[in-house]
């Protein structure tokens, strides 16, 4: 496998891991859809570190792929956090102004 292919494989691996942690795709081992938002944040942090450490050393296509994966995971992470916040708010009694 060429180095460019290895780099794309690494990005794809972390992308799949992020989508699994978002609960968007099933875990290939268990077959279950499981959500772990803390893990998503870790995956995003790893990919951002990878982007920082490879800056200037990757092709335009690799950079575009990495940037796209990070942006997609971040957007979906924020959406899932908002959903969790709405769920939490439904269980709380409303505060009345005074």
Give the residues covered by each predicted segment.
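Well-ordered alpha/beta subsegment
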Residues: 52-60
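N-terminal intrinsically disordered, cationic/polar leader segments
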Residues: 1-45, 49, 61-87, 91-98
């Amino acid at each position: 496998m060429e180095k460019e292919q290895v780099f794309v494989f690494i990005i794809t691996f972390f992308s799949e891991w992020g989508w699994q942690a978002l609960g968007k795709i099933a875990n290939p081992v268990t077959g279950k859809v499981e959500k772990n938002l803390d893990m998503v944040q870790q995956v995003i942090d790893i990919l951002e570190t990878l982007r920082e450490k490879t800056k200037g050393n990757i092709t335009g296509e690799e950079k575009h792929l990495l940037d796209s994966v990070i942006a997609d995971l971040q957007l979906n992470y924020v959406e899932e956090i908002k959903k969790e916040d709405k769920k939490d708010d439904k269980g709380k009694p409303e505060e009345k102004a005074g």
